[in-house]
Curated annotation (Swiss-Prot):
InterPro entries: AlgH-like. It comes from the Bacteria. HAMAP family: UPF0301 (MF_00758). This is UPF0301 protein Mmc1_0726. It comes from Magnetococcus marinus (strain ATCC BAA-1437 / JCM 17883 / MC-1). Belongs to the UPF0301 (AlgH) family. One of its GO terms (cellular component) is cytosol. Disulfide bonds: none annotated.
């Protein structure tokens, strides 16, 4: 039987998800295979900015308006991950579904920090990881909704609107999602 990957999809936390870290989160699933899965939370901003990160890494950041850093997940929170749209000729770049790319190379930050660089990218610290079969088990428990990732939600929309927008992209009114422990979501 062929494995059905969910790479390139959004995982949306349902209101009843018990883990407080993932409450009302949207994750972009970067990799998913028989060995497990890796995703980045795209709607939990940190107080740290790209300007601060670049200063710490002794890099020049020339884009003060493009500054948000996200908490990508609880695993390896010291590791930076960049999601972006245009291929870069650097080592360690991973091609994702739908012509998106991810990398951890600090040179990506150097390139993204230049004036005139790629407009749409997302920088996250840490990632969410699942061992083999763990995500599938959580899906069977209805902990997550799954939908096609949309670049407009990933790159253009404000972080506070992403959870609701991802749910609405499935044709679901978020107010109608039932939280098993507290009744309706709102």
């Amino acid at each position: 039987m062929k494995f059905a990957t969910l790479a390139g999809k959004f995982l949306i936390a349902v209101p009843s998800l018990a883990d407080p870290f993932f409450e009302r989160t949207v994750l972009y699933l970067c990799a998913h295979n028989e060995d497990g899965a890796l995703g980045l939370v795209i709607n939990q901003p940190l107080d740290t900015t790209m300007s601060q990160m670049a200063g710490y890494l002794e890099l020049d950041w020339q884009r003060p308006g493009v500054d948000r850093v996200y908490m990508g997940g609880p695993v390896s929170p010291e590791q930076g991950f960049v999601l972006f749209e245009q291929a870069l000729d650097l080592p360690g770049i991973m091609m994702l579904p739908d012509d998106l790319y991810m990398g951890t190379n600090p040179d990506i930050i150097r390139l993204m920090g230049r004036a005139g660089a790629q407009e749409r990218f997302l920088f996250a610290l840490g990632y969410a990881g699942w061992e083999a079969g763990q995500l599938e088990h959580e899906l069977q428990e209805n902990s997550w909704l799954v939908c096609d990732a949309q670049r407009s939600i990933l790159f253009d929309m404000g972080y506070a609107q992403r959870w609701e927008a991802a749910i609405r992209s499935m044709g679901i009114d978020p107010a109608l999602l039932v939280d098993a422990s507290h009744g309706f979501a709102n």
